[in-house]
Amino acid sequence: MSSKSFWSDLAAQWPIAALAPMDGYCDSPYRRVMKRVAPDIITFAEFYSADGLVHSKTLADTVLPHEADEKPVIFQIFGKDPDMFAKAAVMIERSGAAWVDINMGCPAKKVVKSGHGSSLMINRDTAFRIVEEMSKAVSIPVSVKTRLGWENPELLKDFCLWLQNAGANLITVHARTYKQAFTGKADWSALFDLKRHLSIPVIGNGDVLDYDDGVKRIQESTWLGSGDTVLDGFMIGRSTFGNPWSFLPWHVRPTLREILAIMRLHGDLLWERKWRKWMLEARKHLVQYLHGFPGVKIYRQALVTVETPEMIHTVLDMIAHEHQLILDTIPDDGSSSSQMEAWRSCDIACD
């Protein structure tokens, strides 16, 4: 797919709604589950070391293959060597990925100490060379995910203009500084001035709860009380844990039957893709779907001991049987603070 056709197709889908790259979560099964519920979203994979992909055939063969039903997929890579970034980008392009993204925003101390992630915001010459070398090496779009700045957003505009001039096709900004990491509230107000100065798409990230919240956050008037600048899209991250429905508009709430079906699918996809590592992955992911659910302690204990897909099916069938009166109940209109509280109300009403 050419950059031109990709971006024209993407522009027609405004707003761009994307699954944020999250280490330990955004593997192929997770991306496929998200796309099953919300087919129009874009999914980012977990971020991988550029050096690791180049030097480890095992890693590349494990993480780069992806299925047709999860496309378009974006692979994010981190590192500090422009040559390694270019070589890894070529591998990603050959895998059939839609585009390749550069991590210039991870605030983890180990990452930054190594000269990766957020440290590239203050090692600008290296950052620009990385974008230039990658843009020369591949025909797919090259994008950057960064932060407001190291300590404040004063230099954000200049930094992103240089990234654009170096060849970046899209910029995503997590609306916190490196110093903030994940503390405090994300402040999107600086992103709109950035958007006015760039000719490439700008996506916002940070504290997005769901699709409707994302649409609200990308509008300047939400933050400044006036103004008509609108960002091109948003990312949702941690709010997707156990909740792929967060990508659906109008605060759609799934029925219990729908959630159990997605849990079954997620478990089966993990088994299909990971096999030996399946148990630990399944336990981590599946319990997220039942956070706060009535009787969750018993179900969680059952799920963390499963060893086969059939054992998961047994647990899910047990949940369906014990809550059959609310299997197809549509929870309330959103007045409850969570999906599970809404079910709890239904459960009590049906007793």
Place the predicted regions along the sequence by residue:
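Conserved beta-strand positions in the central sheet of alpha/beta enzyme cores
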Residues: 18, 43-44, 74-76, 101, ...
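Glycine-rich, positively charged N-terminal anion/phosphate-binding segment
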Residues: 2-11, 22-95
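Short glycine-enriched, charge-decorated loop/helix-capping segments at active-site entrances
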Residues: 60, 115-121, 250-253
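Active-site beta-loop-alpha junctions enriched in small/polar residues
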Residues: 22-24, 48-50, 78-80, 105-107, ...
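Alpha/beta catalytic cores of nucleotide-metabolism and tRNA/nucleoside-modifying enzymes
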Residues: 1-18, 23, 29, 129-132, ...
